[in-house]
Amino acid sequence: MELIDTPYYLNETHKHIEKVLSFNDTNVVNMQLQIGQTVAEHEVDADVLIIVKRGKVIFTVEGREVEVSQHNLLHMAPGERHSLRAEEVSDFMVLQIKR
């Protein structure tokens, strides 16, 4: 068992992106963004799960916009091009799982 802290950094910094765990073919990344911050379009050679702990993030996946919050979960297949924009101050987990 391993309990991993994911502290809130946005009181101290403008943006925070950190890989917090890597095992087998899985990476777990904590992203914390201020309102309006973006991540440019890219793709990942893995299944991607987005789990929002705080805030609201707009993902554009293959041209389609979806709002991700604490009330839902986003799955993207390997190779799906996507970008994102924080609609609110946001703290979320990104799980990249290679097939």
Feature map (PLM): residue ranges:
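A cytosolic small-molecule/anion-sensing beta-strand core signal
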Residues: 53-54, 69-70, 88
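Conserved short histidine dyad/triad with adjacent acidic residue
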Residues: 28-44
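Short acidic-glycine-tyrosine-enriched beta hairpin
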Residues: 63-78
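A short, N-terminal "cap"/entry segment at the start of jelly-roll beta-barrel domains
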Residues: 1-25, 60
